[in-house]
């Protein structure tokens, strides 16, 4: 398999922004995080990362398929130092891309990071394999609320890596008031040419459904037809349908409002105090990104060792300091400062979260999302 080993210096989007900030990397409302490892330029391994990992008997190699800006600054090097196993990391931008890459067969990945609804989609299709919990003792660090989940009861196929919520990232100086509704993005010409929407079909259609007062899990073919017409009407006002880089468009001033994940905007806010994030009043979609082993993984023992390593408390803390997403790792969260735990972008207010839902994979609807969005893009 043609794989490229990615080092943090190779990543040119928001992770490189964070690294370039040095001591000031976690500023504004996240300022207190600067003292807890990432700030101050500490490049050393996390204490939990230094313990040696017993050899698995496999060749010292692991192929990791991950989202961009979604790992700690030294995590991969720390794992190599602890285990002797080198990690080759490739990047994907959407779950659709991940699924397409694996649909015809695993090209050689050992660990992948699908979202919850794609775990539901891939497990019945035999695309991911059951995990051996005996090889993942750090599972004990996971908050019990994330163990027996509807999309993967008992965590047979996946380990939780992060959880996240979609909302609106915006430039405060460019809006008349806080855009606390989906309307400016979905149903208005107020910010013509200054908005960007996600390009993942299912997420976008489900969020339009929330705007229309629907559950993300109750859309019908008639709803899809209605939403498709709305999207086509709105398309002339949309600057871009982005993949995993909406925060970059906002940061560069190319757009003023963007549909993005809270962690991505939290990262951007560390260097730009004119940026903020809101979960719209109609509610939104929650996601949980997970660690899975795809069928045909060439190094399954190394994969288990790597997943277990990522669930270590200190390792998880270092990852969380970098990516600024909510963590389901209770042991790691306990090590984080109050500035992280109490940040309303990373952990939105309870009133906003009460109207948010996890999306379920619906095999009857997924083709409709994709076909309708293809027509929208072509219109």
Walk through the language-model features, giving the residues of each:
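N-terminal secretory signal peptides
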Residues: 1-13, 23-31
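Bacterial lipoprotein signal-peptidase II cleavage site
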Residues: 36-46
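Early extracytoplasmic/lumenal segment of secretory-pathway proteins
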Residues: 47-121
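Extracytoplasmic ligand-binding site segments that recognize negatively charged/polar headgroups
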Residues: 65, 70-72, 108-109, 113-254
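A ligand-binding cleft/hinge motif common to bilobed small-molecule-binding domains
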Residues: 118-123, 251, 257-274
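Periplasmic-binding protein-like
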Residues: 164, 224-233, 239, 271-297
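Mature extracytoplasmic/periplasmic domains
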Residues: 294-354
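Conserved C-terminal helix/tail region of periplasmic/extracytoplasmic solute-binding proteins
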Residues: 350-379
């Amino acid at each position: 398999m043609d794989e490229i080993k990615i080092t943090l210096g190779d990543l040119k989007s928001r992770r490189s922004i964070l690294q370039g900030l040095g001591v000031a990397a976690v500023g504004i409302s996240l300022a207190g995080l600067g003292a807890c490892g990432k700030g101050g330029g500490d490049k050393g391994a996390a204490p939990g990362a230094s313990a040696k990992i017993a050899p698995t008997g496999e060749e010292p190699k692991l192929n990791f398929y991950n989202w961009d800006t979604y790992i700690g600054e030294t995590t991969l090097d720390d794992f190599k130092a602890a285990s002797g196993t080198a990690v080759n990391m490739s990047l994907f931008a959407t779950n659709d891309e991940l699924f397409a890459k694996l649909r015809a067969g695993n090209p050689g990945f050992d660990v992948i990071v699908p979202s919850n609804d794609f775990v539901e989609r891939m497990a019945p299709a035999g695309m991911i394999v059951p995990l051996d919990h005996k090889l993942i003792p750090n599972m004990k660090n996971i908050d019990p609320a994330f163990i027996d989940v509807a999309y993967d009861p008992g965590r047979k196929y996946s380990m939780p890596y992060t959880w996240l919520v979609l909302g609106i990232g915006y430039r405060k100086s460019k809006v008349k008031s806080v855009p606390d509704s989906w309307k400016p993005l979905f149903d208005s010409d107020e910010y013509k040419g200054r908005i960007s929407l996600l390009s993942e079909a299912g997420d976008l259609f489900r969020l339009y459904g929330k705007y229309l007062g629907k559950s993300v899990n109750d859309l019908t073919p008639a709803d899809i037809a209605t939403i498709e017409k709305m999207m086509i009407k709105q398309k002339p006002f949309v600057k871009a349908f982005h993949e995993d880089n909406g925060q970059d468009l906002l940061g560069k001033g190319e757009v003023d409002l963007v549909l993005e994940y809270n962690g991505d905007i939290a990262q951007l806010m560390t260097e730009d105090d004119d940026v903020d994030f809101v979960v719209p009043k109609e509610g939104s979609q929650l996601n949980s990104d997970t660690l899975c082993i795809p069928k045909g993984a060439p190094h399954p023992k190394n994969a288990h060792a790597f997943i277990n390593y990522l669930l270590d408390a200190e390792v998880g803390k270092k990852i969380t300091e970098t990516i600024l997403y909510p963590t389901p790792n209770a042991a790691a969260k306990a090590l984080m400062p109050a500035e992280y735990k109490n940040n309303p972008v990373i952990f939105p207010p309870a009133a906003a979260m009460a109207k948010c839902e996890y999306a379920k994979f619906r095999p009857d609807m997924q083709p409709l999302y994709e076909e309708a969005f293809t027509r929208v893009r072509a219109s």
